Amino acid sequence: MEKWNREEFEEVVVNISRVTKVVKGGRRFRFSALVVVGDKKGHVGYGIGKAKEVPDAIKKAIDNAFKNITTVNIKGTTIAHDIEHKYNASKILLKPASQGTGVIAGGAARPVLELAGIQDILTKSLGSNNPATLVRATIEALERIKG
């Protein structure tokens, strides 16, 4: 496992959700955080953290994200070819775009692409909009791109 220099990476909190466990005495609340980290040079990762307080959940998610960093093949400011990928019920289509187009992406896919260092890309998300599955589908699609 590579040791990453955390100062070079940016972190984006994609989603924070409150989850509830119903027990005999009432409800127990916890927080779940989804974080994406990237250095804008072709390295990106995501992590999920759960804790009783939001800052603790975010810290755990960042730690998990650094354990899941992958390398993305970037061709100039975009990707090399079209790709379509499905993870669970989330499906994502990624298409290369000409320079100056920008990142055209919705929801949870945008921070993944921006933190990977991709500046020009067209995307379409189909199926489920669950942030966790959409982030994972986007990262898996980027991993499958051949240089």
From Swiss-Prot:
GO biological process terms, alphabetically, are: translation
Q: Does the keyword Ribosomal protein apply?
A: yes
Q: Where is the S5 DRBM domain?
A: 9-72
Q: Name one Pfam family in it.
A: Ribosomal_S5
Q: Name one GO molecular function term.
A: structural constituent of ribosome
Alphabetical list of InterPro entries matching this protein? Ribosomal_Su5_D2-typ_SF, Ribosomal_uS5, Ribosomal_uS5_bac-type, Ribosomal_uS5_C, Ribosomal_uS5_N, Ribosomal_uS5_N_CS, Ribsml_uS5_D2-typ_fold_subgr
The answer to keyword Ribosomal protein applying to this record is yes
Per the record, its GO cellular-component terms are: small ribosomal subunit
SUPFAM superfamilies documented for this protein: dsRNA-binding domain-like, Ribosomal protein S5 domain 2-like
The alphabetized UniProt keywords are: Ribonucleoprotein, Ribosomal protein, RNA-binding, rRNA-binding
Q: What does this protein do?
A: With S4 and S12 plays an important role in translational accuracy. Located at the back of the 30S subunit body where it stabilizes the conformation of the head with respect to the body.
Q: Which NCBIfam families match?
A: rpsE_bact
Q: What's the record's remark on domains?
A: The N-terminal domain interacts with the head of the 30S subunit; the C-terminal domain interacts with the body and contacts protein S4. The interaction surface between S4 and S5 is involved in control of translational fidelity.
Q: How does it assemble?
A: Part of the 30S ribosomal subunit. Contacts proteins S4 and S8.
Family of this protein:
Belongs to the universal ribosomal protein uS5 family.
Q: What is this protein called?
A: Small ribosomal subunit protein uS5
Q: In which organism is this protein found?
A: Nitratiruptor sp. (strain SB155-2)
**What gene codes for this chain?**
rpsE
